Swiss-Prot record:
Protein name per its UniProtKB record: Ribonuclease PH
Superkingdom to which the source organism belongs: Bacteria
Molecular function per GO: 3'-5'-RNA exonuclease activity; tRNA binding; tRNA nucleotidyltransferase activity
EC number(s) given by UniProt: 2.7.7.56
Stored InterPro entries: ExoRNase_PH_dom1, ExoRNase_PH_dom2, ExoRNase_PH_dom2_sf, PNPase/RNase_PH_dom_sf, Ribosomal_Su5_D2-typ_SF, RNase_PH, RNase_PH_bac-type, RNase_PH_CS
Role noted for this protein: Phosphorolytic 3'-5' exoribonuclease that plays an important role in tRNA 3'-end maturation. Removes nucleotide residues following the 3'-CCA terminus of tRNAs; can also add nucleotides to the ends of RNA molecules by using nucleoside diphosphates as substrates, but this may not be physiologically important. Probably plays a role in initiation of 16S rRNA degradation (leading to ribosome degradation) during starvation.
Similarity remark: Belongs to the RNase PH family.
Binding site for phosphate: R86, G124, T125, R126
PANTHER family registered for this protein in UniProt: EXOSOME COMPLEX COMPONENT (PTHR11953), EXOSOME COMPLEX COMPONENT RRP41 (PTHR11953:SF0)
Organism in which the protein naturally occurs: Dichelobacter nodosus (strain VCS1703A)
Keywords, comma-separated and alphabetical: Nucleotidyltransferase, RNA-binding, rRNA processing, Transferase, tRNA processing, tRNA-binding
Assembly mode: Homohexameric ring arranged as a trimer of dimers.
SUPFAM superfamilies xrefs: Ribonuclease PH domain 2-like (SSF55666), Ribosomal protein S5 domain 2-like (SSF54211)
A Pfam family it matches: RNase_PH_C
Length: 238
């Protein structure tokens, strides 16, 4: 039995609220159980130096946690003077995932930055940031289209992400912190709306896992991601 009595293939309660920031071109607050992540998308009419003059855009992300997003207060990374390796890895994952569904050449020479700030953490913050970040990104692109700054929609599809893993020998969908921290295997899966895999991050913490067990986790992830995508479409009015 899972700690909070969910079925093995049952997601936590999911809620996505759009347009929660009056300044950002796109924004979303995603709540997955007790995990809450605020995602904002900002448009800038410039690109990184390595893309200048190539008539190509860029999508990137930054990720952070509020000091009391976790059980005990953590010092702000700005106060430490440097980002932790975990933070850098997560924000690269978010940016890389979102770029997979954007035609950067159709975006023009501009950047969209997703800022993903964890308000409250109870497992699955990076996957929630990807799923919520997609909403913010889609709305920012919608603004560009409405303003006539884009000739064609650069969004090539939909994507979402979820965590899966083995906890006490059982394959589980959407791990909360108490499961994630004790899982024998932990995976983060990103997929698009064609059912294709964008990213698999998987680690065996307590024991190695077989190909058959990995397939079982992928099946769970596909189920969860389809549910998240249905909510994304509902929120976006698609």
């Amino acid at each position: 039995m899972r700690p909070h009595h969910r079925l093995p293939d049952q997601m936590r309660e999911l809620h996505i609220e759009r347009a929660v920031n009056c300044h950002a071109e796109g924004s979303a607050l995603i709540t997955l159980g007790r995990t809450q992540v605020l995602c904002t998308a900002s448009i800038e009419e410039r690109v990184p130096p390595f893309l200048r003059g190539q008539n190509q855009g860029w999508v990137t992300a930054e990720y952070g946690m509020l000091p009391r997003a976790t059980h005990e207060r953590s010092t702000r990374e700005a106060a430490r003077g440097k980002q932790q390796g975990r933070t850098q890895e997560i924000q690269r994952l978010i940016g890389r995932s979102l770029r997979a569904v954007v035609d950067l050449s159709a975006l023009g020479e501009r950047s969209i930055t997703l800022d993903c700030d964890v308000l409250q953490a109870d497992g699955g913050t990076r996957t929630a940031a990807i799923s919520g970040g997609f909403i913010a990104l889609a709305d920012a692109i919608r603004v560009l289209m409405q303003q006539g700054r884009l000739k064609a929609n650069p969004l090539r599809g939909q994507l979402a992400a979820v965590s899966v893993g083995f906890y006490q020998g059982e394959a589980l969908l959407d791990l909360e912190y108490c499961e994630d921290s004790a899982a024998e295997t932990d995976m983060n899966i990103v997929m698009n709306d064609a059912g294709a895999l964008i990213e698999i991050q998987g680690t065996a913490e307590g024991r190695a896992f077989s190909r058959q067990e990995m397939n079982a986790l992928l099946d769970l992830a596909e189920k969860g991601i389809s549910e998240i995508m249905a909510e994304q479409r509902r929120v976006l009015g698609l």
